[in-house]
C-alpha cells in the first residue's frame, strides 16, 4: 500500500469498490439514523466479520449522488490512521430494496441503494457516557483525549478539517481504541485560508465563536474549540455550553469566556455579525471560576482550547505536549480499559423514548380507568381489633413495610518544535442529550439571526444543523452525520506529535480523582 508523506494525502490507494452487493452482508441491528439514511451493524456472510453499514439516502437527491457522501468517501479513502475510522468498501443493492411484504421501499422500483462499509466500533462516546452509573476515571479521560488529539492532528497535517466533532462522532471499541468518524462535513483546506468556507457547520453546542460571528475564512482552530468542549464535558459530566439557538450559544460562550474585543481578539469587530451580538456590557473571562473544581493542569489546557481568538487557540500537536498528559495519573493503556455492552447514542435514545412512552401509556391507562374509591371501614369499638390489621402491626401504619433496594501505546517521540498557535493570517475574518442548564443569555436583543455567509440557514429555529432535530445534531451514531448541507468546495508513521508513550507500567499507581459526577 502506498504511503502518504506528512502534509499529503494518499492518492495511490484505489480499490475496486462497488463491485460487491449488499447481499454479502446480513443486517443485525440498526445503530444509527440521520438525514443521510440508516446505519446497521451487519455480518459478512462469508467471513463472519462484524461491520457497520451506512446506507446513503438517494430518494431526495435530484442531481445524483449526494455531495456530502462524495466528499466523505474521497477523504476517507486517503486517510489511514489508527484513530480515524476505516472505510472498508462501497457496496450496492442492484435493485429496489423491499419491505417485509416484498414491496419496493422506494417509489422508483428501479432505484437501488449504496452502502458505505466501515469497521464496526462497539460504542460512541455519547452512548458510553449515557450508560447508567458510568464513571470515567482520570486516566481513562486522558487516554480518550490523547487518542482524539492524535487522530485530529493527523487530519490537520493532511489539510483536512473535520467540522463536526462531538461525542456521537467519536467511536470507541472494546479494546479502548477511539476513532474519529463521520466525515460528511469534512473538507480539505489550504494553509493560506484564502477560500470562503461555510460557517453553517459544527453542531451548535460545539461550534466556535468565529463561526457564530459569521466567519467564512477559518482553519484547524475550529476543530480545537470543539475538542475543548468535549474535554470539559468529560471532566464536568455534562455539556458546558448547551445553547438552544445561535444567539443563546454566543451568550453562553461570552458568559464563560468573556466578551471579545480588539484587545483580546484583534479584528473581531470586523466580523460580519459582531454588531448584531455585541453584549450590552463587558463580561470578564471566567473559565477558571466556572471550572475551579478541575485539576490545575486540566484547567490550564482547557483555557488554551477555549481561547476566543482562533489565532491564539492551541493546536492539536501542542495540546498533546501539554503537561496534563505527562503528570500523574498518566493516561492508561487503552487495552486496560473495561469492556462494556454495546452503547450507541441511537440505542440509548431509543431506550429512553420507549421508557417515556411506557410511562405515558401507564398514566393514560390510570386516567381512563381510575380505581374505585373503597368505603371507609366501620367504626370499631374500643379494644376491638381492626379487621385490616395483622397482629403485631402498628395501628398508625397499616401497610406492611417494603424492602428498600441497593443502590495502544503510541510510542511517539517528542514532536518537532513549533508555535503553539495557529498563524495569524486567515483567522481574523474569521447530543449528548441536554443534561445541562436551560439556556440563559437573552441579552442580545430581539433581532433575527443574520443570514449572511455561505450555506443555508437551519430550517428550524434553535436547531444546530439542518434536519438534525436539536443542537446535538440528531442521532447519527458516529458513522454518519446529522446534516446534509451542501458544502463549498500515507499512513501515519511512528513519528508524530507528543513526547512518546506515557502510559504507566504494570504495577504503577493509578490515582483515582473525581470531577463533578465523574470519577
Swiss-Prot record:
Q: Which GO terms describe its cellular component?
A: cyclin-dependent protein kinase holoenzyme complex; nucleus
* InterPro entries in alphabetical order: CDK, Kinase-like_dom_sf, Prot_kinase_dom, Protein_kinase_ATP_BS, Ser/Thr_kinase_AS
Give start and end of each Protein kinase domain: 25-325
Compositional bias (Basic and acidic residues)? 336-348
Q: Active-site residues?
A: 164 (proton acceptor)
> Could you say which EC number(s) this protein's record lists?
2.7.11.22, 2.7.11.23
Where do Low complexity bias regions lie?
445-454
Q: Which GO terms describe its molecular function?
A: ATP binding; cyclin-dependent protein serine/threonine kinase activity; protein serine kinase activity; RNA polymerase II CTD heptapeptide repeat kinase activity
Task: Give the family, as the similarity comment puts it.
Answer: Belongs to the protein kinase superfamily. CMGC Ser/Thr protein kinase family. CDC2/CDKX subfamily.
List, alphabetically, the SUPFAM superfamilies matched.
Protein kinase-like (PK-like)
PTM sites of type Phosphotyrosine: 36
Residue numbers carrying Phosphothreonine: 35, 198
**What are the protein's UniProt keywords?**
ATP-binding, Kinase, Nucleotide-binding, Phosphoprotein, Serine/threonine-protein kinase, Transferase
Q: Where is the composition biased (Gly residues)?
A: 426-444, 464-483, 490-499
What GO terms in the biological process aspect are recorded for it? positive regulation of transcription elongation by RNA polymerase II
The Polar residues compositionally biased stretches are 505-519
In its UniProt entry, what is this protein called?
A: Cyclin-dependent kinase C-1
What does induction of this protein depend on? By auxin. Down-regulated by cytokinin.
Q: Where is this region: Disordered?
A: 336-519
Q: Which residues bind ATP?
A: 31-39, 54
Q: Which residues form a coiled coil?
A: none
What reaction does this enzyme carry out catalytically? L-seryl-[protein] + ATP = O-phospho-L-seryl-[protein] + ADP + H(+); L-threonyl-[protein] + ATP = O-phospho-L-threonyl-[protein] + ADP + H(+); [DNA-directed RNA polymerase] + ATP = phospho-[DNA-directed RNA polymerase] + ADP + H(+)
Q: What Gene3D superfamilies does this protein's entry cite?
A: Phosphorylase Kinase, domain 1 (3.30.200.20), Transferase(Phosphotransferase) domain 1 (1.10.510.10)
